[in-house]
Amino acid sequence: MCDMLDNKLGNRLRVDFSNISKQIEIPNLLQLQKKSFDYFLNLDNGESGIEKVFKSIFPIHDPQNRLSLEYVSSEIGKPKYTIRECMERGLTYSVNLKMKIRLTLHEKDEKTGEKVGVKDIKEQEIYIREIPLMTDRVSFIINGVERVVVNQLHRSPGVIFKEEESSTVANKLVYTAQIIPDRGSWLYFEYDAKDVLYVRINKRRKVPVTMLFRALGYKKQDIIKLFYPIQTIHVKKDKFLTEFNPNDFMDRIEYDIKDEKGKIVHQAGKRLTKKKAEQLIKDGLKWIEYPVEILLNRYLANPIIDKESGEVLFDSLTLLDESKLAKIKEQKSFDIANDLANGVDAAIINSFAQDGETLKLLKQSENIDDENDLAAIRIYKVMRPGEPVVKDAAKAFVNDLFFNPERYDLTKVGRMKMNHKLGLEVPEYVTVLTNEDIIKTAKYLIKVKNGKGHIDDRDHLGNRRIRSIGELLANELHLGLAKMQKAIRDKFTSLNADLDKVMPYDLINPKMITTTIIEFFTGGQLSQFMDQTNPLSEVTHKRRLSALGEGGLVKERAGFEVRDVHATHYGRICPVETPEGQNIGLINTLSTYAKVNELGFVEAPYRKVVNGKVTNEVVYLTATQEEGLFIAPASTKVDAKGNIVEEFVEARQDGETILARREEVQLIDLCSGMVVGVAASLIPFLEHDDANRALMGSNMQRQAVPLLTASAPIVGTGMEQIIARDAWEAVKAKRGGVVEKVDNKSIFILGEDDKGPFIDHYTMEKNLRTNQNTNYIQHPIVKKGDIVKAGQIIADGPSMDQGELAIGKNALIAFMPWNGYNYEDAIVVSERIIREDTFTSVHIYEKEIEARELKDGIEEITKDIPNVKEEDVAHLDESGIAKIGTHIKPGMILVGKVSPKGEVKPTPEERLLRAIFGEKAGHVVNKSLYATASLEGVVVDVKIFTKKGYEKDDRAIKSYDKEKMALEKEHHDRLLMMDREEMLRVCALLSKASLNSDQKIGDKNYKKGQTADISELEKINRFTLTTLIKAYSKEIQKEYDDLKNHFQNEKKKLKAEHDEKLEILEKDDILPSGVIKLVKVYIATKRKLKVGDKMAGRHGNKGIVSTIVPEVDMPYLPNGKSVDIALNPLGVPSRMNIGQILESHLGLVGLRLGDQIQEIFDRKQKDFLKELRAKMLEICSIPRLANEKEFIKSLSDEELLNYARDWSKGVKFSTPVFEGVNIEEFSKLFKMAKIDMDGKTELYDGRTGEKIAERVHVGCMYMLKLHHLVDEKVHARSTGPYSLVTQQPVGGKALFGGQRFGEMEVWALEAYGAAHTLREMLTIKSDDVEGRFSAYKALTKGENVPATGIPETFFVLTNELKSLALDVEIFDKDEDNE
């Protein structure tokens, strides 16, 4: 299928092997976060997330009901600073929230204390400052740093039933139910070893479940009726009879069924079929005998009362025995609880037995008879042990636990899950529990225990949902407001007099809200430093799903099941992409086509199948909706009309693969690639790679550094374009039009919409630093005169090539050993790659220094630094800052700074020096910013911020002037273009209309009724034009005025835009208190490929560069071309990533076919265009590429030439995941490219020129350079800083630390008997302070190293002992001998 037919870009043609035309475009990869945040801030004009949160907290009343605070409305302001400013100045990109609050003062009746009316109403607007705003690139800027809030995958609220192995009794299963709210107390129901049903609230002590029911207001009889079928036993002629109910005998029958006369109608142990039961009823069986032995262990359902005295003989739930039965026989009938019925057991009866004892004790201590009140008190005591309690407080407490919307929230999702699981019909707006919920949950748990219910799988995606940024922020806001609500209530109690003077602002402290939100963004586990290495890292970071974070799992405690791939992940969560290490399986990524619905459940797309015919209707289903449906894979054979060819299809149902008839199939996968996520779908031939290697491949693509020149892969998957489309790095046209002007820094597009012409301007960003210090640079990919559509990519970002993601380079590789240098995955690289800067990347480092206001004076940024040689400051400008373009080496001064010294009385010598050299010399101390040991590069930019009220230095003024000039030029260019366009349109208008009078236009005279020539009209100036227009009809004059007005308005808009930019430029710099000047220096470093750098392919085939070989020494092909990279063939078989072999085959085909197209260009025959078209059609002659063929036929000569030039460097292929090139197609391509069928070739040794004995696999593979660069890892130290207490060298490159010589290394030296080395390690190279000083002195003077002293560790130990009040004395060995 050709992706060029609907390709918005049209810059590159790929030979696309996908089988299935894309039914729906891949949804925007970042829509989940965008939609979620828009909902939170009400950017889609519904009820916003913020409003919901406010309404859940307000109104707040005071305890005496005198005052109430109500929320009226909220309004969101505009951001004060632009994104760029926030990043440069270390600010937060945020908005202010204006909240309107109403305070009502009520009139109260003095006697009754009830509200009588309203005394006063006050409304006030309260500002909540700094609510971070999401940027258009779906990230947040917090204190100048770009961060991402990761989506959380957590357990959905609702009810869940589990079956687990008992921790106390072997081989016994324990059944539990949990009601999980979004906010509030958890409720656990659980069986114990003795089959008693208990309940726990919030993991506190368990109480029998009947205690909870009683606390909810149920009487004993009500509970029995709710849980047990009541069976009435009639006493006739000393026999116990009951009505025949076939449902009681659905399972195996425990006793013979006898009729009234004692005749056996059905024997015990035999199954009673439905047919047999109907027959028995037909035969007149109404009453059957209830065996006494069964009756003996039953319980009474209702109390038995003596009819004469009215005395209760036996209470309900009395266990029947022979003596009791003898007494009961006097009654005509009695009721028993049928605990032998289907799906019930004795759990509730056992619970009553347990709670009876507790209630008896409570009755005595509390002097209350009502069991419901006692139960409430018992629950209160369990939840708040040790607190005194009264019954009303206990009842209110139980009610608050589950039925108060302020304390308990199931959310809409939880209510939906409860209703679905328990078959309830509670309206979805009821987000608190109901009594029915609790009863039904206990009932269902009993059913589960007795094999009748369905056990839930907590890893099923129907039981896990996604909390995105909007919901996470709403939760944080709720926490902040809850804190504020508590503070307001406290303030209410302290208010006594002067209630009339109270204003809303006195009660509300908005800081509480702000700090909660800022804490979430700066310290929350889900708010992360954005991974910005390349566009892919950024996109996948924003699509990440984490099971960790607040309210989620803890990685140390997460088991294997949670981390494992679940059947419901299909099409929803990528099974490949997850980190290696302790977070494996806890951090996942959304699949490519997956969407998240309003309730937070992940949906996968399918096409509907009706009677074996695939329709074009696409449906998105959640894991729960998909249960029980038959789903066919996308690879199912379908004819041209959409009918499934084969009668039986391998379909999926609930995670199982089964053979289903085609008529039974209800859905079919949208496409094969829907299973995997974005990063995995970039790996061609993924289906041939082992899962572990695919995981490494998808993770390593995120670590690829942007290279100096990007080039798209020859073997792609078609996904490269989608990522470039949704990543913010590329510049996309906002509106369609024609490219009017383009240079390296800007693009101007002239277009026309309903209102008329307009000009859009796009600036190219250059040399910006990303979070990972990679270089961010944009360059245009359109030419002047190109027609551009809205949404089209007009400029590439980093790691992009012609609007496609390009994270690496196509390299010619050979799988062969090379003198042992590619042992253990090492990589041998040709010098040509280094010489041509193929894998060179640019990294930008930021260094900053502040000048502060100190008590002794102010620090100064200056070139005038004491005790520094002239040549050391030669590269600084007059203001003391390194000039742009300076080559920086380690130890050089980047910014000169002097700090005032505290005033000490000067010595006579100092006074003399000051008298000679002026005041400055002795007062200040050098505090300059120096380049660190590993920093080397070129200064590319400098930013200077000066506090208001302080004078700007020359450098800052120059920088300001330069930026202002650039803005003025851009504005001037746009105005010129507008003027030119206006003149052209006016001339076009007048050239079509006839004159009303004789006129001289330019050099020609025109008579009345003639039309002027457009070339003459274009020669005249504006002023002449205004007089000329009067010679035309009123209609033309009106059209002219409309045109003029439109252009006038457009110019006003441009002026307003320009003024806004100038205003931003002229804004005062905001700096932290005490800082008067901030200087940031940006240094760009070129990192060429070096020995020790890590490289990788896309299939998890990683390695370290082991040697760089001269081009002449590398093995070469028969045509003389030498190989770029030699890889070890042993890296393939055991790793099982065969995808790399297929990729290199297809890559070689692309190169060879490209060479053939280049030959046609080189020959440049008369009809070479025909030859080119024929060649390109030949390449697309494979049946699967019919659409490409049609497309190439439809191209104009100019377009064809454009695509052919691109193909001459290598024909680009697109082999989507699971739809790659097959064997037959490979053999056709090999023939076309004139490659041997085994894909191998003869090679010659570069050093000897001899032919290598075996034929070698040579191909073209896409290689990446990863950000584990040797330059950033290599580190050496001779002397340096030491730890304060232990006096041992500090550790780590960042602190310029030493290499740790640990316990095990000491053992190694002991084993070798290397005593002197060992002594040196433990003393002068570690913590012998005097020893190391004298050793250093001796070495510098060329003397012998003196004897070592006592290590500091010894003193640390003795001082530790002294701190324990132990007197420790140290004796010298020599003194001891005396």
UniProtKB/Swiss-Prot annotation:
<dbReference type="Pfam" id="PF00562">
    <property type="entry name" value="RNA_pol_Rpb2_6"/>
</dbReference>
<dbReference type="Pfam" id="PF04560">
    <property type="entry name" value="RNA_pol_Rpb2_7"/>
</dbReference>
<dbReference type="GO" id="GO:0003899">
    <property type="term" value="F:DNA-directed RNA polymerase activity"/>
</dbReference>
<dbReference type="GO" id="GO:0006351">
    <property type="term" value="P:DNA-templated transcription"/>
</dbReference>
<comment type="subunit">
    <text>The RNAP catalytic core consists of 2 alpha, 1 beta, 1 beta' and 1 omega subunit. When a sigma factor is associated with the core the holoenzyme is formed, which can initiate transcription.</text>
</comment>
<dbReference type="InterPro" id="IPR007121">
    <property type="entry name" value="RNA_pol_bsu_CS"/>
</dbReference>
<keyword id="KW-0804">Transcription</keyword>
<dbReference type="InterPro" id="IPR007642">
    <property type="entry name" value="RNA_pol_Rpb2_2"/>
</dbReference>
<keyword id="KW-0240">DNA-directed RNA polymerase</keyword>
<dbReference type="InterPro" id="IPR015712">
    <property type="entry name" value="DNA-dir_RNA_pol_su2"/>
</dbReference>
<dbReference type="InterPro" id="IPR007645">
    <property type="entry name" value="RNA_pol_Rpb2_3"/>
</dbReference>
<dbReference type="GO" id="GO:0000428">
    <property type="term" value="C:DNA-directed RNA polymerase complex"/>
</dbReference>
<dbReference type="InterPro" id="IPR037034">
    <property type="entry name" value="RNA_pol_Rpb2_2_sf"/>
</dbReference>
<protein>
    <recommendedName>
        <fullName>DNA-directed RNA polymerase subunit beta</fullName>
        <ecNumber>2.7.7.6</ecNumber>
    </recommendedName>
</protein>
<dbReference type="Pfam" id="PF04561">
    <property type="entry name" value="RNA_pol_Rpb2_2"/>
</dbReference>
<keyword id="KW-0548">Nucleotidyltransferase</keyword>
<dbReference type="InterPro" id="IPR042107">
    <property type="entry name" value="DNA-dir_RNA_pol_bsu_ext_1_sf"/>
</dbReference>
<dbReference type="GO" id="GO:0032549">
    <property type="term" value="F:ribonucleoside binding"/>
</dbReference>
<dbReference type="GO" id="GO:0003677">
    <property type="term" value="F:DNA binding"/>
</dbReference>
<dbReference type="InterPro" id="IPR037033">
    <property type="entry name" value="DNA-dir_RNAP_su2_hyb_sf"/>
</dbReference>
<comment type="similarity">
    <text>Belongs to the RNA polymerase beta chain family.</text>
</comment>
<dbReference type="Pfam" id="PF04565">
    <property type="entry name" value="RNA_pol_Rpb2_3"/>
</dbReference>
<dbReference type="InterPro" id="IPR007641">
    <property type="entry name" value="RNA_pol_Rpb2_7"/>
</dbReference>
<dbReference type="InterPro" id="IPR019462">
    <property type="entry name" value="DNA-dir_RNA_pol_bsu_external_1"/>
</dbReference>
<dbReference type="InterPro" id="IPR010243">
    <property type="entry name" value="RNA_pol_bsu_bac"/>
</dbReference>
<dbReference type="InterPro" id="IPR007644">
    <property type="entry name" value="RNA_pol_bsu_protrusion"/>
</dbReference>
<dbReference type="InterPro" id="IPR007120">
    <property type="entry name" value="DNA-dir_RNAP_su2_dom"/>
</dbReference>
<dbReference type="Pfam" id="PF10385">
    <property type="entry name" value="RNA_pol_Rpb2_45"/>
</dbReference>
<dbReference type="Pfam" id="PF04563">
    <property type="entry name" value="RNA_pol_Rpb2_1"/>
</dbReference>
<keyword id="KW-0808">Transferase</keyword>
<comment type="function">
    <text>DNA-dependent RNA polymerase catalyzes the transcription of DNA into RNA using the four ribonucleoside triphosphates as substrates.</text>
</comment>
<dbReference type="InterPro" id="IPR014724">
    <property type="entry name" value="RNA_pol_RPB2_OB-fold"/>
</dbReference>
